């Protein structure tokens, strides 16, 4: 049976009197691929922020890699990698320099992870090319490399 990576039980997020997410329960299993779709303003981003521990739910329970406490979730976030729709990179930095900047910002130990991430997304030979000169597909793959830097679970 696949391991549960993330589970939510009736999580809700309120901003004042406005309810952004209302009573969502779900379970994400290891080895599966999931998508999150919905209309604008439906709460997708808020749900993702709660699922990745960036914000806490107003009510309900979040379990991430078996941890339910806020402190445990902070520790477990090191096992996550996320790809955003529009990654923000420095245009005049190389791919390698951009990843090095984010590696340091996140406190990820070891420079080998940069070469590993670039190889995994087939950008190993473009590490010295400036981000501004990348094609759209290459920019998206660099965003994926960023998500792989900390070698997520």
Positions of PLM-derived features:
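Conserved ABC transporter NBD signature motif
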Residues: 60-70, 75-76
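Conserved ABC ATPase "signature" region
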Residues: 100, 104, 111-126
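Hydrophobic anchor residue at the start of the ABC signature
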Residues: 144
């Amino acid at each position: 049976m696949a391991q549960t990576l993330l589970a939510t039980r009736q999580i809700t997020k309120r901003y004042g009197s406005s309810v952004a997410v209302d009573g969502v329960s779900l379970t994400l299993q290891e080895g599966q691929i999931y998508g999150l779709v919905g209309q604008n303003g439906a709460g997708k981003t808020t749900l993702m922020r709660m699922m990745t521990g960036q914000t806490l739910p107003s009510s309900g329970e979040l379990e991430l890699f078996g941890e339910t406490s806020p402190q445990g979730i902070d520790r477990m976030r090191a096992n996550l990698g996320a790809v955003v729709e529009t990654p923000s990179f420095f245009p005049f930095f190389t791919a390698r320099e951009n990843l090095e900047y984010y590696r340091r910002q996140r406190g990820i130990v070891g420079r080998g992870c940069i070469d590993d991430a670039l190889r995994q997304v087939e950008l190993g030979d473009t590490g010295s090319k400036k981000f501004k000169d990348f094609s759209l597909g290459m920019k998206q793959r660099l965003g994926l490399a960023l998500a792989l830097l900390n070698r997520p679970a």
